[in-house]
Amino acid sequence: MKDPLLFTPGPLITSATVKAAMQRDIGSRDADFIELLASIRSELLRIAGVSRDQGYEAVLMQGSGTFGLESVISSVIPPEGRFVVLANGAYGERMAAIAERLGISTRLARWPENESPDPARVQHLIEEEPAATHVAIVHCETTTGILNPIDEIAHIVKAAGREFIVDAMSSFGGVPIDLNKLEIDYVISSPNKCLESVPGFSFVLARRAVLETTKDCARSVSLDLFAQWEGLERNGQFRFTPPTHALLAFARALEELREEGGVSARAARYRANHEALRTGMNELGFAEYLPGERQSNIITAFRYPDDPNFRFEDFYHYLRARGFVIYPGKLSRAHCFRIGTIGRINEQDVRDLVAAIGRYARLKPSYVSATI
């Protein structure tokens, strides 16, 4: 049976060659595997536009992207530290929840889900928090698809002398990030988003100068970021069992990113996908949740039709039966569904999805009148 097309923010559609890369076994302590890990770490820094010579390190961490986030939060904020989270969606809220569970002094600053953190308010907030040592934000908040202004926020945070943590799960590899210019201290991401690979681990790009200050700070053994980096530096290996097959797939996915033309070329494909989706859905009468200037090309939230007969479950299963998978909404105050435009998909795939949505609409007379 043919796999469906995944219009999701990840895990997502991967190429046949990325999947094929997992069809072999490799020893986790083998010299070839250690060489593979070293090449992956170097390539991640290259994608971010930095290098070890510029004082940056790439640390691979077993587990999902959230494991990488928890690794950073639990490892780099000292016992006397204070953590400020700028949140406008579920994933910002998750960072604060992690910190609070760990007993870290935390301030959660909330914005509406359809608004980005306002730099002026962030400036005031940091001035109100002289004890704050670390500030964090989600770059692309996949609750809505909003792209937060990390350039402006980074300038404010660094000018105040605080360390800056960026959750770039859904943006790294698909949205250019100038790590060196912005002086971001920690960027966390995962393979199964814009890098178009499979899940199984996360990675952290860190400024070495700040990472070196975190020895013995971790609140976890398995998620100790400094110890993980130290182990990779000492013998090139994970401290615990690495996801060997996922790393083989990732190495191939990184090659394919380079072959495509790098982050700018991939971003252009995602932009074209998003434009095809936006145009097609607008023609069907669907309203986007976000204003265009705040919308990323990663995932888009659409409001439910103004029709009491609309049932997302019916809509979802109709599309799934025809080979398309979309996401339900995750908003706290609005009924939406979400459609991703990343992964190994193109404009024609998006048009095919929109055509299927149009056919569904025509099957529902009241739905058609409400949307078209």
Residue ranges and their predicted role:
Residues M1-A31:
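N-terminal "arm"/small-domain region of PLP-dependent enzymes with the aminotransferase-like
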Residues A21-S71, S75, A90, R94-E100:
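Conserved N-terminal alpha-helix of the aminotransferase class I/II PLP-enzyme fold
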Residues P117-G173, Y186:
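Active-site phosphate-binding strand-loop segment of PLP-dependent enzymes
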Residues A287-Y318:
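Conserved PLP-binding catalytic core of the aspartate aminotransferase-like
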